[in-house]
């Protein structure tokens, strides 16, 4: 939105002041210039599919003012990124804009406006976008980007705004836009409110939308109240008060909100992914679910069902789940058609293994153990209970073992830059597999499936012996084996001799002995930790990468090549917390927490309220610079690491463990938690300033042994006091 003073020069920078405030699902920008104060609130109304730009302008001067207000939206010429940005010989000749009443209407494939409703030509029909104005009359408009900007002009000085009037022309071919100008007359001290509405919807509906904002201020205020109430309601199910403001703001608001964004969008919509990704990544989406289970289990279970329906009947996950996913009728990576359509040529070793902790966390949070008997179709054919789906995932790993008896790395094993194939083996996946069997034994015990428990016991023991004999290397776990048997990540390798994830997952899985856990975690701290978090491995690949070590394509200290891959920070937080190392767990949190980096924003560069995919590591000259914001698995792994690890909220099928692992400097903390229809007020006291451990536990004044609270002891309003 551009504000011009009629008959005056464009904005002079040193007289202009502005602020930008971000809230849950809205952004507010404020500016002051030449006695004019403006505030614009950007948001999408609850359960709507268009955007509102709600502008209030106040004349703080002592004279009447006449202001040109221009709202501008630059439309793409096609909803597909490649068609819009690359195939210009097509996309620049299918659009036009026209003015209708109080809005600029863009039409893609406008020449198809005479075909019958419901009919398409070459799978194409007219697509409509609009920008409309409510609360004031339209003075002038423009629908052509080139004419709006003007020759030799830029977005800071578009010719239409400089001249005070747009040219009332639409575009026909080339580049569309929607620009609308209105003139506001303001007496001294007067405020006026208008709204620009932007969306992709048919013309008739667009007209009704704009008309519904006639009482602009009242409608927008009400919508924002509803939006804020919705999000605060979602976040209110788990709130904390600790001695750390950074920890509080991330867990209570911004990490939680980030988790909802990744849960909703997966990796499908951002300026980084470019809107080109044509589905949900299996591992990404299943992990994202974990971040919202403690806040919105009813939302989480719907996505769990969806992802279970994207599991192939052989137990593997579809690497990419199409937006048009049709359970029971999908092609798989075994079919050439799937590979051609999605670009994913093979299964990944880890995809289905993420189901185990995710399903377990949902059932434990809700107590809905009966969920494992729910019947859900497989992606390609047949159906089975959730329990059967999990058993098939075990079968998939069992049927894809390498020559040592560990899971094969296949096309990738979480690390997309490790191609181990059908013969190479992954320690990371082996530890995931070990953990999956531990979880499934709990479900099998509930099912009284003794025969299967015996099978899992024997299989887990066999796998454990292999990991112990082949993967422990004095003070660390190796990363795995190449297809020809070469060890990845052994102590004397010249490059990549220390890896983060096998160490954290050796602890998370419950495999590592106390001695191994302490040694491995200490090596992580000594070798991998930095002031911005732990790097993924060290030293970076450069001259000694094996054929499947694709990380070597990246510059040293970048992404998988010894960058600080932020998703892994959540796992090292959890691992340290599970071992009772509260100081270390919190240190890893604070090193990578967005809210703790405002004093070095010029280095980090990302927003101070959301996580990024990675931070450049110590081998980079830009050490500390972060990238790929919002849509990252970091949101969920850090949330789990903090809630289950540092705060110690660890439910199981029948109750709740409270086992905090906190900085010893903390005197204590409080939690407000909704849990299975009960509201828990939890007070943790730390008079002896220890990092972990439970000295006493009171539930509604009743002493309870240990740190475990059976569900039967909980009431509608439950008071819990734990002394460390």
Q: Would you name each region that the model predicts?
A:
Residues 270-279, 320-347, 379-385, 404-426, ...:
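Carbohydrate-binding/catalytic loop surfaces
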